[in-house]
Amino acid sequence: VRYGVAPDHPRIKQIIVALYKILQRGDIRLLGNVEVGRDVTIDDLRDHYDAIIIATGADRDHPLDIPGVDLPESYGAADFVSWYDGNPDYPRTWPLKAREVAVLGVGNVALDVSRVLAKHAEDMLKTEVPANVAEALADNPITDVHVFGRRGPAQVKFTPLELRELGKVPDVDVIVSEEDFDFDEGSEEALRASNQQRQVVKTLTNYAMADPEEHTASRRIHIHLFQAPVEIVADENGHVKALRTERTALNGDGSVSGTGVITTWPVQAVYRAVGYYSSPILGLPFDERAGVVPNVEGRVIEGDTTKDESAPVIPGVYATGWIKRGPVGLIGSTKSDAQQTISHLVEDASEGRLHANTAEVGHEAMVALLESRGVEFTTWEGWELLDAYEQALGEAYGELPGGRGTRERVKVVSRRAMTDISRGAQVDAASADLIGEMGEMGVPTAPERFDDYTGPGRRN
């Protein structure tokens, strides 16, 4: 949620409230800032716990195989999302230099990327956007974002609410061409079967029917359908100067084929939002083709493919979410997925099929192991300190100009600063460079109560 949901989507982030209630019950313990493969191994975890559930999601961009994809201004959406969400493992700066930008893909990630690129910085300030990101967006020269999809309006993967949201962004027009509306029997069948898809088509139609004379905003988001990217074109200096697409046409069943009609679109940057891909976990098998940990209904299996359901099960190791089934579905759709995995875990526990531990079992034993290795781990109590600190940074802004309210928080970006705050250390204005480029705003010192924390992992 912290590094995957756009900062201007507080509605989606409300899932945090439910997670808070669970973590505050006291029967779930958090050990943060611990990397599997660096600080602990899968074998360490299997030795200390009866079962392991892998829920690491998908953090990489799915590859796109077209000429020019490796040009310097060709960016993966996952990297851009990680930057604007303040992921500490990504650079603090982003080269926002292009006036015209292409976004490849017709899912909600493409909408997020397009919206953040087009939105004025002052309209992001009331969110938890990191200070360095807000400052970069303030200097963004962009005027036009072009979103490209291979198929038609009946096949796009936008959800209705996120698509309608584009039309509410201040000083941004959404432009759709009437020429991009075509439906075959497969399309009509898809619309009959899905009320959500009918809502999406209705919203796209409303954008297409808007009076062009009403398009007076300083920034525009253009949605182009039936356009398949075929090449990212470089100038003589090796920088992006254009995107070439091929016009496609419906085949009758909802699929499309190329028509041979090529269009060149002048853009200076390309963002690829064509899907996510999970990263392998050291010590576990990985299906490179599917981008998941091989499993059968959540039980992790040996081998390198999920398709081999006869492969031996690795006792006590399970998977859930995108690392289990691939990057499909939203936060809510993971519930049934998790229930399936947990039902198998409970069944295996009752049948005595879990892994036999070889070390001292439990949380305290793992804490002792981490401390013996010098790992600066953090806890739930430490997260509460960081949460309060970020809210204090937001309060320091006071009222935003133009009646935009107040900042809910300012997200701390640096891993070092997050670790220090979470472990009870004092972080003050002298450490502003660790928190992010705060501009002319002074960074408030940590409240005294942060120094009162004496929980596990406290750094003396």
Name these PLM-found stretches.
Residues 2-4, 11, 15, 111, ...:
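Dinucleotide-binding/catalytic capping subdomain of oxidoreductase cores
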Residues 16-74, 221-224, 230-244:
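Feature captures the FAD/FMN-dependent oxidoreductase FAD-binding
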Residues 33, 97-100, 142, 226:
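Phosphate-coordination loops involved in phosphoryl transfer and adenosine-cofactor binding
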Residues 44-51, 96-97, 257-268:
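Core beta-strand elements of the Rossmann-like FAD/NAD(P) dinucleotide-binding domain
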Residues 51, 55-62, 107-108, 228, ...:
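Glycine-/small-residue-rich beta->alpha transition segments that form the dinucleotide
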Residues 61-139, 292-306:
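Glycine-rich dinucleotide-binding loop and its adjacent helix/turn
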Residues 72-91, 232-235, 239, 251-325:
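FAD-site-proximal beta/loop scaffold in flavoenzymes
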Residues 303-460:
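C-terminal, flexible cofactor-proximal segment of oxidoreductases
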